[in-house]
Amino acid sequence: MTNPIRVLHVLGGVGLGGAESRIMDLYRQMDRDEIQFDFLVHAAAVDQRKPEFYDEEIQALGGHIYVLPKFRVYNYFSYRRAVQDFFAAHREFRVVQGHMTSTAGIYLPIAKRAGVPVTVAHARNAGVVKGPKGLATKFFRRGLAKKADRCFACSTLAGEDVFGKAAMEAGEVKIIHNAIDVGRFTFDEKMRGEMRAQLGLSGYLVLGHVGRFEYQKNHPYLLDVFAAVCKERSDAALLLLGDGADRPAMEEKCKELGIADKVRFLGNRKDAERYYQAMDLFLLPSFFEGLPGVLVEAQAAGLKCIVSDTVTKEAQATDLVTYLSIEGAAEVWAQEILKQANYVRRDTAGELKAAGFDVSSQAEGYRRFYLG
C-alpha cells in the first residue's frame, strides 16, 4: 500500500507513561506501509513545546506530532476553536483514537463532524486526582460513551470509571487489556547478574518501582514502606524508575527518613527491562490505576509483585501478585516483602502470552479494526 491509512492518537503528551508506552509497543508491530500513527498532544504554549521521550522514535517510524493548547477549563472556547481548526486542516485520518478522555467529549465529536470515519474513546485509567481538576474531568466525561463511535477500556474498572456502569452493562465498551512486548521483559539470569554487578547490588535485597512521580503513584507511602524494610534488612536497596513534578519532594523525603543512600532515582529509562531483571520484588502502592502496564512487565520478568488492592485483578496474569491495602501501616507491607523475599525466579513468558498480554498477538486485532 503506497498511501497507508493514518490513525491519530490523542494524548496529553508522548513522554514515558503507561498509555504512551503501550501505544508505542503497538506502533512498532504495525506494517507502516499499511497503517501509520500520528499523535495529537497538548502543551501549555504550543510554539514552545519541548521534545518528549518518544518524539524521536515517532518521527523515525514515520509519524507526525501535532500540538494543541493545554485545556484549562477557562479556555474552553479557545480550545474548541483550536480543535476545530486542526481537523479542518487535517482530513487525512481514518481513525481518531482518544486516550485523553478528560476532553474526549470535546474533540471526538468535532473530529466526527469534520468527516473522520471512526472515532474511539479509550479509557486508560481509573480514578482522577482530587480537587477542581478531578471535578472538571468528571464533568467533561459525562455521556462520553455516546460521543464516540467505539469505546475501548484497558480494564473493567477503567471502563466503569470513564464510561459508567450502564455503558458497560449495555455492552457498549470493549475491554482490551494493555499488552506488552513479552519477549523484551522475559527473565534472563545472565542479564540479572550483570545488572546487579553494574549497580553494585550483588547480594542485596533489591526492591523496585516504575512510575511517574505524581499523586496517583503514592510515592510517599512507598518510601515509608522501604524505610520499614531497612529497619530489618540493612542490605536493602530501592530502584525508582521514572520522573515527574514530585521527584524533588521524594528526594527530600528520603533524606528525612535516613534512606537517601539506599534509594536510586534513575529517571526515565529506555532500557527499563534490564532494571526489572536486577530487582527482587516489584512494588506498586498506587491510589488508582486502569490496568498498569508496569505490573504486566514485572510479571513478565518473573518478579514477585506487591501492589495496592485498588489495582484491578485483571492485571494478574500469574500467581506472582499479592494485593495489600494502602490504608494501614507501612510495616504491614514491609513484613510481606520480607516474607516473600526468597523465591525461585522463573520464566513466565508462556503465562503472559496465554493470558493475552503479548502485543504481537493483539496487534492483528487492531490492524483489522483500523483497516475497517
Model-derived features: where do they sit?
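A conserved mid-protein helix/loop that constitutes part of the nucleotide-sugar donor-binding site
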Residues: 20-25, 205, 209-228, 245-252
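N-terminal strand-loop element at the rim of the active site
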Residues: 3-5, 9-78, 86, 172, ...
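Short His-centered aromatic/hydrophobic patch
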Residues: 98-104, 123
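A short helix/loop element that forms part of the nucleotide-sugar donor recognition site in Leloir-type
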Residues: 83, 186-200
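Nucleotide-activated donor-binding/catalytic signature segment of Leloir-type glycosyltransferases, i.e.
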Residues: 251-267
